[in-house]
A protein has these predicted regions:
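C-terminal transmembrane bundle of multi-pass solute transporters/carriers
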Residues: 2-9, 70, 81-92, 97, ...
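Juxtamembrane intracellular "pre-TM" segments in multi-pass secondary transporters
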Residues: 10, 14-34, 208-257, 451-454
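Helix-loop boundary and gating motifs at the non-cytosolic
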Residues: 20-81, 249-297
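Hydrophobic core of transmembrane alpha-helices in multi-pass small-molecule transporters
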Residues: 42, 110, 121-137, 344-358
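Conserved MFS/SLC helix-loop-helix module at the cytosolic interface between two early adjacent transmembrane helices
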Residues: 80-118
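C-terminal ends and interior cores of transmembrane alpha-helices
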Residues: 105-119, 327-340
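Cytoplasmic helix-loop-helix junction between adjacent transmembrane helices
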Residues: 127-169
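Symmetry-related core transmembrane helices of the 12-TM Major Facilitator Superfamily/SLC fold
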Residues: 189-207, 411-428
């Protein structure tokens, strides 16, 4: 594929001072992109985490039973899953900035619906609309940051995603504590604040997500509005073909996607139950629940800084971090389900959630190393598709087997075993070099991808 920067003679200069100036401009642009990525990521998590303590309690207060809550959360994951590929195509077709802005607008509407309506069906529709909105940003923001910063090497990717995780954790902590505090006044109040935050984030994403022309994609020729639908179908076919060829040419990438999906599944099961499990243990105090949810994310910030410095010194450190974190997380979740002392159980659960957060930057960096830039957003959406379908299906099975959101005797030990095994699998793949050969397509048509370069 061609690069996103024209290399013709008319764009080159013989001035000896220009290369250094150009390097400074590129470095300054990368810094601006990184700051924009961190700010938008932080706002994204702040808005979502405003609801982490109160959302299930709000749905129950509207008359939704435990089984229905389990089914609704599973439906959220499934909606996200089936929407991932179409919205990934739109991200590549319409532009990643527009896709992220659409995501925030849809979530602003969905979150606000839960505030303005006391009807359980309207509330459920708002939850599903918010889930749909989330898929527009899935992969698009990440792909934009990787391409615009030029972070292609392992150390650059690890640094970008570690910093992104820190920004996400900052948003998570602030959002969780703010939502818990607002929830003590009214369970619906965090919803409207989340909606307003998403509206603000939509404006900021349009202002901040600027930069050079998308890499590996020539400028689109102007076309009439009526041609949009054919272009969408054509783009969908091209990207799906490119994704299929990329995955077929890189078995390690396929395995990474599947293993990461298992990590999300086994993190998702206790993630649904924790509010109900610990509400009685803390006497229904939402601020305590918010603090409990935030402690793990606060711990991640210095730990991520330490793991980043370790990875700079040792190339194999990524695997060490994932193995250690997944093993410790699995043991912690078993202890959280088994121990009778509430305080100890809370500490163990916090350790489990922290371990998951430490695994993810390395997993995301390993995937991005192996994805061709031209279809990065869509391939990342394919990964999110597997995450969503695995987790949604797993939650349905868990709901049928457990039946009660507050029961951990069966679900948490099984989730712990799966989490540990998936972590070891991911770790075995995360430091393998991308060696898949370049894959070309036949030239029988002009609409298919001309080349899919294996990273």
């Amino acid at each position: 594929m061609t690069s996103g920067t024209s290399r013709g003679p008319e764009n080159e200069s013989t001035s000896p001072g220009l290369p250094g100036s150009a390097d400074k401009d590129l470095a300054g642009h990368a810094d601006r992109v990184r700051r924009g990525y961190l700010l938008v990521s932080g706002l994204d998590y702040f808005a979502d985490m405003l609801l982490t303590v109160t959302s299930v309690l709000l749905l129950q207060s509207l008359g939704m039973g435990s089984g229905a809550v389990f089914a609704l959360i599973a439906a959220v994951w499934i909606v996200e899953g089936v929407s991932e590929i179409p919205t990934g195509v739109l991200a590549d077709l319409l532009g990643r900035r527009a896709s992220v802005a659409i995501s925030f607008v849809l979530r602003a509407i969905g979150y606000s619906a839960l505030f303005f309506s006391g009807n359980v069906y309207v509330a459920a529709a708002g939850v599903l609309l918010s889930a749909l909105g989330g898929t527009f940003a899935s992969g698009a923001l990440e792909a934009w940051a990787v391409d615009e910063t030029g972070a292609k090497d392992p150390s650059g990717l690890d640094r970008l995603f570690a910093q992104g995780k820190i920004a996400e954790n900052a948003g998570l902590v602030l959002g969780t504590l703010t939502g818990a505090a607002l929830g003590t006044l009214d369970l619906a109040l965090p919803q409207i604040v989340a909606g307003l935050t998403c509206a603000l984030a939509a404006v900021l994403s349009l202002r901040l997500m600027t930069g050079r022309r998308d890499p590996d994609r020539p400028p689109a020729a102007p076309e009439p509005q009526a041609a949009f639908a054919p272009r969408l179908r054509e783009s969908f076919g091209e990207v799906m073909t490119g994704t299929r060829l990329t995955l077929r040419g890189d078995k390690v990438l396929i395995a990474l996607i599947l293993a990461a999906a298992l990590l999300w599944l086994f993190r998702g099961i206790p993630g649904v139950q924790w509010t109900v499990v610990y509400e009685g243990l803390v006497g229904g105090n939402l601020l305590v629940l918010g603090a409990m949810r935030s402690v793990g994310s606060l711990l991640e910030i210095p730990l991520l800084g330490w793991t980043l410095s370790l990875q700079k010194r040792r190339a194999s450190a990524r695997r060490t971090v994932i193995v250690t974190a997944s093993t410790a997380g699995a043991l912690a979740l078993v202890c959280a389900a088994a121990v009778k002392e509430p305080a100890l159980s809370i500490v163990c659960y916090v350790c489990f959630s922290t371990a998951f957060g430490l695994c993810m930057p390395g997993v995301r960096a390993a995937m991005n190393e192996r994805i061709d830039s031209g279809h990065r957003a869509t391939v990342l959406s394919v990964a999110s598709l597997f995450n969503s379908l695995f987790t949604g299906g797993g939650l349905i099975l868990t709901g049928l087997a457990v039946g009660d959101l507050g029961s951990t005797a069966l679900a948490w030990p099984l989730a712990a075993a799966g989490f540990g095994i998936a972590g070891l699998w991911v770790a075995s793949l995360a430091v393998r070099p991308g060696t898949a050969p370049t894959t070309t397509t036949s030239t029988t048509g002009s609409t298919g991808p001309q080349e899919v370069r294996a990273p």
